[in-house]
């Protein structure tokens, strides 16, 4: 791909500025982290709620490959610690397989009305992720709910998912995430 590898810019300790294409990537990611933190706090304290005015209790991430493995590993590594330290906020589920039985199995374990879904696709065109999004949206609609009130996107600013009214919010990553030198 002949791009910088800057996935480390998503971490909490960003260090020095990294300038690429004339843009301070550290400033970009610091801003995105602040937006994500603000959104998460609003979900946890009940400022962002479902269409019935009720808090979300579960988060379900839809992604594949790198859009699934890191967040899943982090959740599994920290879940018991968070529970032991009384900082556990929400149960997390993950949909990353295009087998409809797998997605249906995950969906069957959640209370759809109290679940917020995170769709993760850098390009916004990943077929497997979009297939699972369609499956989940159908399930939300069958429950008499509005998918736009239950979904957020994590994508690049140039993706079809960006600035899209079908999502409560969108958070951005750069093309340098997953880049190869």
Which residues are covered by each model-predicted region?
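Glycine-rich phosphate-binding loops that contact phosphosugars or nucleotide phosphates
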Residues: 38-45, 53-181
